[in-house]
Amino acid sequence: MKKILCLLLFVIISESSIAQGYHNPIIPGYHPDPSVCRVGSDFYLVNSSFQYFPGVPVFHSKDLINWEQIGNVLTRDSQLPLKGASSWLGIYAPTIRYNDGTYYMITTNVGHGGNFLVTATNPMGPWSEPIWLSQQGIDPSLYFENGKVYMCSNPGDAVWLSEIDVKTGKQLSKSCMLWQGDGGRYPEGPHIYKKDGYYYLLISEGGTELAHHLTIARSRNIYGPYESNPANPILTNCSRKGQNLQIQGTGHGDFVQAKDGSWWLVFLAYRNFGGSYHHLGRETYLAPVEWKTGEWPVVNGGNPIDTLINATTLPKQMMPQAQPLDFNRADLGPEYIHIQNPISENYIFKSNKLLLKGHGSLSDNNQPTFIGKRQEQVCGSVEFKVHPKHNAEGGISVYQINDGHYDLFVKDGRVSLRCKLKNIDYILKSDKIWSEWMNLRVSYNDKMYKFEYSDDGTSYKSLGELNCSLLSSEVAGGFTGVVIGMYADGGDVEFAQ
């Protein structure tokens, strides 16, 4: 009886602790470079999207813990040209801000025009056409004060500031260098905040890998000079206490103050699996901030970031629910994305089926016919019925980069598993099939992807397993994470649930 009471007490205490805290990441899967703003009781957050279309996902939350994607900022080809963009190019590090009834999103389209901003009166859109900006560098940010608008970015390995006209994009003042950081490489991702008479300048340093970290400086004048925080870095897991944690690469953050006066930091990090490999990409995390009057901000009590964060002011974290696909809709939802700008006539929704018209290989950078979703969960599965016509190839791709993907596909009466890794391109296994429609299934955990097929949806046969680590950023490369989706090449392919 005593053992039962002790066990019951342990369970109650454990559940109570979880209810008072939350688990990171708050937005799992490839959602890097978060920026956030609060409007009344509502929080809005955006992320980088690189080569994918539509660009810059927009999330909404009432509590900083539970987030829902409500759309994408860049939904038109005229806003987001991505022709030939690899996973190293495209949309870098957006910033979202709200001022006087208008939402602003400023970002960089690397390889296709540089820095620009768009505006909207509703964060769900529609957003304006791009207003192009002359100040160079990446990771631009906006700061509004007394009718003036300032833009900061990082040309030349330093943070520079200028005043701009947000209606025309015209630069109204000469660019002024503010800070070169605290000695780490790649000072980037700048954001300016004003508090207690100081202008605080938050930046990332160290590059977006293992040594990524956040530093901060402040000044009484927006143009400087800026003094470094003696306690820099204010966020890092590349430390004695944090180096052995699963979460690494903490950096690129944005402060936000909740309605109750508390301060919080959203930032990117990644989770290592099977050693020092991450394949899900850089994800969005949250940490509490103590920011006393006139003092420097302290993130998470000065401790490294772990999966469970204790924060009694936040509500219960809800578990996300998987939503079934509806092929009767012409829009599968804002979370579904294409590699580069899609050719619209290659995607036809009809009679609860999706017809994909093949256009180029997944290994090329030429608008392949592909529609997928970021892999957000460590464990799960994806399954579709596939019917290629004539000599077409179609199936499911576990896609990290054009030089790194696993493809389970049907072609010419065979079902095959292909592994594409840089210069390696081979068929792991191929079986003869007789059914026109074939069920394809990809299931996964933290170590392996398993590839199976069935002609009746009940009895499945395995074609093999492939390691998650080979699609990691450390091996395959790129700035993104795994996206799992449907594709077609060389002809028409039908998909059904």
Residue ranges and their predicted role:
Residues 19-497:
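Carbohydrate-active catalytic/glycan-binding domains of CAZyme proteins
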Residues 4-13:
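Sec-dependent N-terminal signal peptides
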